[in-house]
């Protein structure tokens, strides 16, 4: 299979007559046409063939600089927060307020960085499987220079080696067949993220066992942190999951938020602005801040530390300008 990336983000795969042969075998050349929309500045294009045994062939890279009209990025934000499930026994306290807090921050704080902010909110009974998948599919049309943030807050559950985000209509999470039918699998999320047109993508998951989602993206038996690194490397995205595959995401009444989202907001509001301290919070600064701060804050309000799972691949980019 042939994998193609643009500035470290996977932009497509192809199996059209692609084979990986030993060095001693007779080699055949095949030309495959592709169309890639360049962004302002440096563009790094890479192609590599990978065998069914996941052995990489020799990659080919092409670097070019595009000096076209300067375009300011559009921020596309999808925020999902489910407090109220069809089965009220599943209700949460802070998933919807957490998503609303993320929406409020980016609506007010990032106007200097983005030409406009396009917001999609899916709360409670609006957060159905069909609606969420439709909104994620719409991101395929985003421009390469744009920024995409997808935030998911609600229940998460694992079935076998797969993790599922549970939309509003899930009633019986203890039934594997219902989870498979009504839940949104980690594989579906991965496939849709790969299709996003923007080259700057941040995925935030505030759900129980969300670290398990990242293990499901890779081969069975692979450690979740290795799996997360593979996912980010394959798709060129930055990802933060609230908890490991064995942990529950914490909600704290005193904070008015889940600990994970409270930590995110602390970082975005300026505490993550570190190296360099320039009044701008970048995605990598936010990842580093959450990794250090979340265990500390969760221990303060709970009896044990909550550890996020985070990985960064692709270009760094600004998220917030500190006023």
Q: What kind of region is each of these model predictions?
A:
Residues 29, 39, 74, 129-153, ...:
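Caspase-like (clan CD) cysteine peptidase catalytic core
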Residues 65-68, 273-323:
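Caspase-like cysteine protease fold
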């Amino acid at each position: 299979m042939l994998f193609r990336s643009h500035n470290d983000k996977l932009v497509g795969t192809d199996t059209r007559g692609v084979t990986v042969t030993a060095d001693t075998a007779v080699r055949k050349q095949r030309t495959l046409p592709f169309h890639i929309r360049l962004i302002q500045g440096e563009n790094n294009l890479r192609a590599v063939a990978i065998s069914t045994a996941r052995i990489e062939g020799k990659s080919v890279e092409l670097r070019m600089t595009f000096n076209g009209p300067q375009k300011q990025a559009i921020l596309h934000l999808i925020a999902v927060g489910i407090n109220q499930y069809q089965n009220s026994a599943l209700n949460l306290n802070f998933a919807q307020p957490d998503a609303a807090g993320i929406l409020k921050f980016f609506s007010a704080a990032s106007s200097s960085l983005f030409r406009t902010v396009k917001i999609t909110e899916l709360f409670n009974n609006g957060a159905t499987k069909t609606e969420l998948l439709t909104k994620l599919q719409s991101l395929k049309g985003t421009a390469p220079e744009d920024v995409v943030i997808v935030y998911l807050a609600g229940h998460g559950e694992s079935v076998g080696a797969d993790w599922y985000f549970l939309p509003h209509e899930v009633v019986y999470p203890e039934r594997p067949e219902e989870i498979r039918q009504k839940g949104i699998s980690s594989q579906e999320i991965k496939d849709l993220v790969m299709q996003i047109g923007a080259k700057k993508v941040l995925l935030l998951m505030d759900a129980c066992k969300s670290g398990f989602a990242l293990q499901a993206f890779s081969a069975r038996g692979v450690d979740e942190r290795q799996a997360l690194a593979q996912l980010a490397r394959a798709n060129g995205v930055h990802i933060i999951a609230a908890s490991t595959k064995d942990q529950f995401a914490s909600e704290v009444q005193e904070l008015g938020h889940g600990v994970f989202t409270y930590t995110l907001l602390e970082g975005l509001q300026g505490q993550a602005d570190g190296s360099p301290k320039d009044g701008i919070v970048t995605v990598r600064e936010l990842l580093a801040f959450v990794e250090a701060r979340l265990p500390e804050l969760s221990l303060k309000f709970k009896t044990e530390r909550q550890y996020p799972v985070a990985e960064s691949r692709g270009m760094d980019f600004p998220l917030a300008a500190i006023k």
